[in-house]
Amino acid sequence: MPKMKTHRASAKRFKKTANGGLKSASAYTSHRFHGKTKKQRRQLRGTRMMDSTTVKTYAKMLSTL
């Protein structure tokens, strides 16, 4: 049986929390801010927690983290 390998693209984008959740940076933050309101830009700062149903899928890809 071959070793389980971490999906490297996902490992660079997501961090595992102490309780087993996953956090990541917000999407839509690289350019085209003139089309976003001040409130949208403010809320895009920081990190986001991944939905619990999606965490199960990504946990397999990030099994070795």
Curated annotation (Swiss-Prot):
Residues 1-24 are annotated as: Disordered. InterPro entries: Ribosomal_bL35 (IPR001706), Ribosomal_bL35-like (IPR021137), Ribosomal_bL35_CS (IPR018265), Ribosomal_bL35_sf (IPR037229). SUPFAM superfamilies: L35p-like. Keywords: Ribonucleoprotein, Ribosomal protein. One of its GO terms (biological process) is translation. GO terms for cellular component: cytosolic large ribosomal subunit. Signal peptide: none annotated. It comes from the Bacteria. Residues 1-16 have a biased composition (Basic residues). GO terms for molecular function: structural constituent of ribosome. PANTHER family: 54S RIBOSOMAL PROTEIN BL35M, LARGE RIBOSOMAL SUBUNIT PROTEIN BL35M. Belongs to the bacterial ribosomal protein bL35 family. This is Large ribosomal subunit protein bL35. It comes from Leuconostoc mesenteroides subsp. mesenteroides (strain ATCC 8293 / DSM 20343 / BCRC 11652 / CCM 1803 / JCM 6124 / NCDO 523 / NBRC 100496 / NCIMB 8023 / NCTC 12954 / NRRL B-1118 / 37Y).
